Amino acid sequence: MSIPGNSRRRGSRLLTTNQLVFSSHPSSRLIIGEGCAPSLLQFALLDESRVTMRCRLAHLLTAAMEGVVLLLVPCAVWPFGSVHAYFQWLLIVGVGLLLVLWAARTLVEGRLVWVSCPIALGLATLCLLVIVQVIPLSAGAVGILAPGTASLRGALLPAAPEPVGGGSLTTSSVPAATLSLDAGATRDGLLQLVAVVALFAAVRNNLRYPAFFYRLAWVCAANGVALALVGMGQLASSPSNVVFWSVPTRGAVFGPFICRNHFAYYANLCLGLTAGLLLGTRYFQGLATEVRRPDREPQLAWREMFRDPRVLWLAACLAIVGAGLVASLSRGGILGLIAGGGTAVVMLMARRATLRWAMLAGTVSLSLLLACWFGFDRVSHRWQNIWHDNVAAESRVAVWQRTLPLTARFAVWGSGLGTFERVEQLTRVPGDSWNVLHDHAHSDFLELWIEGGTIQLLIALVIIGLVVHRGARAFSRHASNSMGFLALGGLAGFIAVVVQSFVDFGLHIPAVAVLTAVVAASLANLAETPPTDALPATPEPRPQGWGFPVALLQAALLAAVALFLVSTAHRAEQAERFRLASRAVTADRRVDYLKAAVALAPERVELRLSLVDALLRRADASASRSRAIMPLTLGPTPSVPGLAAVLALTNGIPGPVFQDGTDLREAKTQALIARQLSPLQFDAQEVCLRLGVESDGPERALDRLLLLSPSMPEPWLQAGRLALGRGDRSKAYVCWRNALRANEGLLAEIGRAVPHEISPRELLDQVLPPNPAMIFDVVAKGAVQGLSSEDERRFCRAALALLAEKGEKRIAEDFLLEARIHTRLDDVDAAINAYRAALAKKPRAPAWRLELCQLLYRTGNYAEARRELILLRSEAPANSQVNDLYHQVLRAEQQ
């Protein structure tokens, strides 16, 4: 192959004039330019073997990279989606190996191995913005760049130094402020993001030949079938929360995924690639173009198609994976499939109006039959409640509406990658669910907007648009051959992932992120590959251009990134291993294990809080074996035992007493550092209050707890006690009302203040929320002792007034409550009418009907009681209480 010009590079040597030029491929023929000296010819012949060896070595390195990727994609799924630290480390080791092989190829070819790609540039920009979030900055710089973050940090951290063991822990003793409100969580997210970007870049720059995408599609087809079969097998033979028939979880599992929605992400990508393989067979050659095969009659082509094992296997794969997707009950996954499939159909119809719908219809029908076999009732019931899905205790829409204002609070830089779980609690109000944490927003885009700000969201949308554009270009460029359909299938799967990400958070699962990145890189590569029907096994390295020093610099950079990824992931995995091991050892060994974990991952706040707990337990055990310390609670729990210090301040109740010593001083230091690392961490704030290291007093510390989690009841209760002890009655009333909104079970606790600290009228008018059931409980359950008969009637009338305000919106339970209140007031006729109204709205309520019968019997309405009891006995013939009352009524009638 002759290259025109006076100057070209061959390998790493530059030859000029009438130069000898040859192809880098071993099978190429040697061509000699005119006027070439014999010595130059001899030099070229000697150097040809070196170039051939370099080509072969480059081919081997590329093949090794392909093997690593084709191993990572399926293997990342089976260990629970690689969500645990150990499996994430193994996954990152694979990415590091890819980078090392890439660096070796760069050195072998002696050139810069890099393709200009705006998608890679966008991903690198995202990484850079996340790095900025964790850079230590001064308080003034944070205030200028992120006023919302600075104001929140100022509200959550005291300004004065706090005493530790006779001294004080100054701001120089703890990490500096960052744009992220939890630098440790953001660094964990940054590690995963860099790994995904590195994987994308490795595929984008090295596996650019169509054969890789073809083999990837076959691997995904086989893996998708295996996942669907395992998932449907578990569905038929195992509880819905058990993975692999032996591992219980808290989620609704499907296959190896803890959440069934995450299977839908992976399944949609597998479905798209499998459909691309099927449409890429020779029987669909004219599907996307107007060109027909003249050598095949339509009838003959159809007969051959149904005799082709490859077509039958691919159709079966589509049916099985499709049935698995439907059986997973993932509505977001189905919506994504409709969006991706609809896009593919529109693109096909735009190129050709006549399609072979029979194969598609048969595949869809088979999928529906399999779905019916595994229970169509479950599927239809799931879709009937599409807008009423619960994310733990509240719907997705409620979470989105509540957290959307956070996008304005952290508009530019965001709150920090991985901080949604903490900032979400800031948006709650008393009465919201307080014992459930939302670790994700169930919308990747909303979560990115909150954590990364508007800049990162816009960059992510641009990246998605570029991938879709490259996918459409790849389909258009290869429409005349099988790779065009494969590009169309990959694009459909990618669009399905994007659409589902609006209502789910599957891109946080490493296995899903890996496959999505590989498919996106392959689409970008295919958009730049010349149209061809051939599927070359390996690429041809073409030495050219920039010289060995640049190649050496790139290799060093790749090796450094690989070392950073692997070492950081290994330290995180070892820290998690020490944390888990600390649960099964003695107190002394537990402290040692947790210290080792903190040394490996010093910015993980949870590790420091666990160490504080271990130190306090050891200090308490050494001081008194007869007294136990109440354990710290990671996350909201039904009680906050750490507030015993506030109880001691308000009521004189002695709280935990720690003897000052090394363990206690170290516990205080670790608690303060944990709070400085993550001011949003409720447990860090709580333990600082518990240990008495607050420099601005317990009242200010309680205000911080209330700011962090307004829906938790215990801080409101203790804040009310503290305010009442200091004479601020109006604040005490507000705090106690919020406590009752959050937890009605605190009514008895607050009722103890009557009549010594507050009067019954103050309790009714100032403290109790407008809840008729709670107001009636004060009387019915004796939550407040010593009420006079007039006070009881006042509470009952207040409850009735609130019920009357509901008007026609009253439900059966409201009428039941009204009946009980009238019974308490001895208003029999009104009570009977209310009971009948409740039973009219809810006829099959035996307990309510029994209450009505008892009331009728007590008031002498025996005939009505007997009629109601006859009806009740038909509903509950074995109820002894009903039968006894029936016989009593009969005897009363006879007398």
Residues of each region from the PLM?
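Terminal, low-structured helical/coil segments at or just beyond the last alpha-helical repeat
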Residues: 763-782, 809, 866-895
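Internal, charge-rich low-complexity segments
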Residues: 139-160, 271-294, 612-643
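Soluble catalytic regions of membrane-associated enzymes that act on cell-envelope
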Residues: 427, 434, 567-785, 790-793, ...
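TM-adjacent membrane-interface loops and short helices in multi-pass inner/ER membrane proteins
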Residues: 133, 203, 259, 397-438, ...
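Extracytosolic (periplasmic/ER-lumenal) interhelical loops and adjacent juxtamembrane/interface segments
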Residues: 140-180, 406, 418, 422-426
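Hydrophobic alpha-helical transmembrane segments in integral membrane proteins
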Residues: 375-391, 543-588
